[in-house]
């Protein structure tokens, strides 16, 4: 852990240091019991004493999924007294003190207790209309557990509370995940109180079978009970090779965003302290995948948090009836890519695509749950293939 914090100190990565405290299924029982006070407090004291000299650590966390009670309040009080320079976080602070006879929606304190300095949530929703699932049906306990499905922006816009808002767990990376990741960050950047979030989690926790490339997980060892593949929820694979999710995270977390506004290309500087005057922007124009033009654009001196016009689409030569694309990459003085985008320079390619008759598709292979179709090259817009299984 200390080596990781040293690397964060060197690279300027903001860190939340979390106490090793999780009681999970017991919820608030232990934190509301005086007999456990010393054990809870010990976790906070050891963490702060061990890591107090790391400048990358900007706030402490009281733990994870342990309900909330007097013992957590004691941890927060000690940390505030020991180190008044750092904030104290705990997502579980919104849960009830004592869930002895089950939970109901009214048990959740939407305003969050005063002993924490951050309003924190698991998996809040974003505003985009198509990303708003309904609260699931179920028992009062199940509905209460999902009462945290608040809209992220609504929390940040509360007028009676000006604390920063954090998603201490979000963007669950199981399977082909992160489909709405960019929408999350468009919303996070839209309000100054939004502080970001922590993806669950970094690496698939599978184990390779000796001498094979087959990943084993729950149940593959004869272990019962198990959670099957639920441990495979990382941004990277078990061998730390990158996944498509990794590419999405890299693109969205980039400190420089490149966007198209009509015929113009703009850059947004998401750095906290750096202007873009010492950065460069390299470009390539491709025609049907082949490089036909490349060079470097003058990067405007964009201050932290600001946007500026980079160039116009008319600055680049285009070719009719071809797949013509503009690739842009913002590069630091150290040669590190900090932003990338690809923009289509020709829309007529798709308009020229012919409509393919349904009977031109040949069924190649089928089963009850899968149909594989083979066709000629298909150029079309707004189409779908709907297999008929019955």
Predicted regions and their residues:
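Carbohydrate-binding surfaces of carbohydrate-active enzymes
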Residues: 187-390
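Substrate-binding/catalytic cleft of secreted carbohydrate-active enzymes
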Residues: 1-226, 231-232
